[in-house]
């Protein structure tokens, strides 16, 4: 269990509780979780973070009524800056989006502006929102993470409790390499409900070579770990930076959707540009 799982800041969340579904607009449904909850135990300070990045959300179940009452549907793309005070709790996000269902808006841009305003207020940070008509995305190919997949190793694993022990002495040699490693075996659990979260992760770095077996064992150790998606990515970035000390590092995870939403956080200390094309499990 994470050290802050019972923090009072989490007590008021609707997550893990029975809730009513409202279908008329209600911005108060949105709930934020302070990023400091997981950053403080990691020694990360808001004014001196070792990374930049965003939390990329895809909204697959977004619908509202136009001015004449005709339902509209869209796919939304949201990017929340890493400097925001709060991350956005996903169940509250789903409930908030449901409140658009029977609400009339004059045009698409009004919907976009409403989302941008409310999400920014909840997160207390910079956010961007784009809405796409379905025909704009038809034929969009399934993407993949560029890099070398480390999953097909002939190793025995019998411990699934989170530990950084695998990263100790996990670099080999003095030669500086630049490579991108990928795993589809990332599985963690919701901080509150402990429901499984399934993801693929891309790790791009420049530095002494990281032992792939030790890295895979470390990633698999998240299997019983309870944290939100964004928190897991920041923990992985911080652990790799601390133990492996790469000159450059980027960590990007794309998680499978739940409740019509997928969350795809990335953190980097270089000029990393994430691909936003959905992966095969998304």
UniProtKB/Swiss-Prot annotation:
InterPro entries (alphabetical): GTP-CH-I_C/QueF, NADPH_dep_7-cyano-7-deazaG_red, QueF, QueF_N, QueF_type2
Gene3D superfamilies according to UniProt: 3.30.1130.10
Location in the cell: Cytoplasm
Cellular component GO terms, alphabetical: cytoplasm
Gene Ontology molecular-function annotations: preQ1 synthase activity
Residues engaged in binding substrate: 88-90, 229-230
Pathway membership: tRNA modification; tRNA-queuosine biosynthesis
Pfam families documented for this protein: QueF, QueF_N
Reaction catalysis annotation: 7-aminomethyl-7-carbaguanine + 2 NADP(+) = 7-cyano-7-deazaguanine + 2 NADPH + 3 H(+)
Domain of life: Bacteria
GO biological process: queuosine biosynthetic process; tRNA modification
Active site: 190 (thioimide intermediate), 197 (proton donor)
Positions that bind NADPH: 90-91, 258-259
EC number: 1.7.1.13
Keyword entries, A-Z: Cytoplasm, NADP, Oxidoreductase, Queuosine biosynthesis
Main location: cytoplasm
PANTHER family per UniProt: NADPH-DEPENDENT 7-CYANO-7-DEAZAGUANINE REDUCTASE
Oligomer status and interactors: Homodimer.
Functional description taken from the UniProt entry: Catalyzes the NADPH-dependent reduction of 7-cyano-7-deazaguanine (preQ0) to 7-aminomethyl-7-deazaguanine (preQ1).
Entry's family note: Belongs to the GTP cyclohydrolase I family. QueF type 2 subfamily.
HAMAP family hit by this protein: QueF_type2 (MF_00817)
Stated name of the protein: NADPH-dependent 7-cyano-7-deazaguanine reductase
């Amino acid at each position: 269990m994470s050290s802050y799982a019972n923090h009072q800041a989490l007590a008021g969340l609707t997550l893990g509780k029975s809730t009513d579904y409202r279908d008329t607009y209600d911005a108060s449904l949105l709930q934020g979780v302070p990023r400091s909850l997981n950053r403080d135990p990691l020694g990360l300070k808001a004014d001196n973070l070792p990374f930049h990045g965003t939390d990329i959300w895809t909204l697959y179940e977004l619908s509202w009524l136009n001015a004449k009452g005709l339902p509209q549907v869209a796919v939304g793309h949201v990017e929340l800056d890493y400097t925001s005070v709060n991350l956005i709790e996903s169940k509250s996000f789903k409930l908030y989006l449901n409140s658009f269902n029977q609400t009339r808006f004059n045009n698409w841009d009004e919907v976009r502006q409403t989302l941008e305003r409310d999400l920014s207020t909840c997160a207390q940070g910079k956010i961007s929102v784009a809405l796409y008509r379905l025909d704009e995305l038809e034929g969009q190919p399934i993407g993949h993470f560029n890099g070398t997949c480390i999953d097909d190793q002939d190793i025995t694993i019998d411990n699934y409790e989170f530990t950084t022990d695998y990263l100790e002495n996990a670099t080999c040699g003095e030669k500086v390499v630049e490579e991108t490693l990928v795993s589809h075996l990332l599985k963690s659990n919701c901080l509150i409900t402990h429901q499984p979260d399934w993801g693929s992760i891309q790790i791009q770095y420049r530095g002494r070579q990281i032992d792939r077996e030790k890295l895979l064992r470390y990633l698999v150790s998240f299997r019983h770990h309870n944290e939100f998606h964004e928190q897991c990515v920041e923990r992985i970035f911080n652990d790799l930076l601390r133990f492996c000390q790469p000159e450059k590092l980027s960590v990007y995870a794309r998680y499978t959707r739940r409740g019509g939403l997928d969350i795809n956080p990335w953190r980097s200390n270089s000029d990393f540009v994430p691909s936003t094309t959905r992966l095969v499990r998304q």
